[in-house]
Amino acid sequence: MNRQINNYPSKRKVQQLLKSKRSSGILLHITSLPGPYGIGEIGKEAKLFIDNLADMGQQYWQILPTNNPETCNSPYDTNSAFAQNPFLISLDGLIKDRLLIKEDLDPIPNFKTKIIDYKKLKDWKSSILSKAATNFLNKEENLLLDKYNNFCSQNDFWLNNYALFMVIKEMQNNRKWS
């Protein structure tokens, strides 16, 4: 092994790595977290998972890409390098931010716990996220509006084109075109 290291261009970095404190972590995609809404979300379950990792002495949580998946629902098959998966948005977080009320979620479908039923999830959660977006835009006193406007201005290099693409895609019934 030393002979291999001596011939390696970044020999010093490799030697430092071999002497460094070992660390460990877990690979788990956010969608695999437990939760009542059919898919793992970036919310309280994610925070609890991080706390549990720390309690177990784990230093890293590796996740798969969180971009918006294309038709096969794979995190590696995305339609944007920048847009995130809207189904990872925490519904409880939207309730906390007063963009939804608990009753907006009713009726919550009976989701399977071992596999994600993407059709059922998308049909249900899309309408709820649309309601949250409408509530956000119609709110008289909106404390999140500055953050939203800042996000839009910082991401204008891709956001408008992506929004246009998604509208056209929806108008085409999500068919692929070239």
Q: Which residues make up each language-model segment?
A:
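Acidic/aromatic-lined carbohydrate-recognition and catalytic surfaces
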Residues: 2-14, 18-178
